[in-house]
Amino acid sequence: MSGRGKTGGKARAKAKSRSSRAGLQFPVGRVHRLLRKGHYAERVGAGAPVYLAAVLEYLTAEILELAGNAARDNKKTRIIPRHLQLAIRNDEELNKLLGGVTIAQGGVLPNIQAVLLPKKTSATVGPKAPSGGKKATQASQEY
C-alpha cells in the first residue's frame, strides 16, 4: 500500500496569466510591479494594472496602424521613425496627446505657407470679354 502516492487528489490547474485572462498582449503583471515600485500610491488595486495595460495596448495599436499606413503610402515594408512622426502629427488627437514629444529621426511635416507659393501668371487667365453691348457666348477655355 505504501509508495502509491496520493489518490483522488485534485490536479492543480495550469497557471493562466492575467494578460491572457484579460485578453491582452501587454503584460499585466509587469505593469502591476511597475506601479508598486514607482510609489505612485501606497496600494495598487487589482483592476488598475489591467486597465492601464489595456489603455497602453490600445494606444500602441492605434499608432502602429497609422504608422503602417504611412509606410505603405511610402512604398516601404518597414516602419521607421519618420512613419511614426507622420502618423502622429497627421492625427489630430494623437498630435494633441503627444504634442510635447520629440521623435528622434522623425523629421518635420511637409508644409509650405501659401504666401510663399508662386503667384498665378496672367497667361493662365483667359481673354477678357468684349466690352461692347453684346455678351460673349463663347465657352471658357480654362481647364
Swiss-Prot record:
SMART domains: H2A. Signal peptide: none annotated. One of its GO terms (cellular component) is nuclear speck. The modification Phosphoserine is found at residues 2, 122, 140. Residues 7-19 have a biased composition (Basic residues). The modification N-acetylserine is found at residue 2. Its main location: nucleus. One of its GO terms (molecular function) is histone binding. Keywords: Acetylation, Cell cycle, Chromosome, DNA damage, DNA recombination, DNA repair, DNA-binding, Host-virus interaction, Isopeptide bond, Meiosis, Nucleosome core, Nucleus, Phosphoprotein, Ubl conjugation. Pfam families: Histone, Histone_H2A_C. The modification N6-acetyllysine is found at residues 6, 10, 37. Residues 1-22, 121-143 are annotated as: Disordered. It is found in: Nucleus; Chromosome. The [ST]-Q motif constitutes a recognition sequence for kinases from the PI3/PI4-kinase family. This is Histone H2AX. It comes from Homo sapiens (Human).
